[in-house]
């Protein structure tokens, strides 16, 4: 086997775990009406894909962890009918990352950022844990929140109670 093939195999072995994200990722946090909800959706990643300067600033950390490839934990809040980013934390030591370090100052209003870049669905469980699935390595919760968002505006928000006897 020549050196080029050996190099390709080694690179593949190194990058496949990164691509597949085999390790369960630390969640972002959503605060809604006093509840703290763990998110498997990462709204800031859509902006990171579109904006290289923000992406570069988010990557400017010494934190490398297989359970947090994005290198930050986003803290979100729903206020009225809108989604806001209210904080960022480093994945390794949980220290706050200043929004001013990552975002242009004119984006920050009242110490939060309106998530006008985000359109999509957020689905998460919260409240009391009712079951654990080894197959999916996740907990199922008494309540399920489903949110449809267009350009940072909440179009639909449904909370379902799960009846698990």
Residue ranges and their predicted role:
Residues 82-85, 154:
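Hydrophobic residues embedded in beta-strands of well-ordered beta-sheets
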Residues 21-74, 78-83:
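Start-of-domain marker
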Residues 84-141:
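An exposed acidic His-Trp-rich patch
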Residues 1-26:
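Bacterial Sec-dependent N-terminal signal peptides
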Residues 68, 88-94, 161-165:
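Short, solvent-exposed aromatic-acidic interface loops
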Residues 23, 121-165:
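Intrinsically disordered, low-complexity terminal tails and linkers in eukaryotic proteins, enriched
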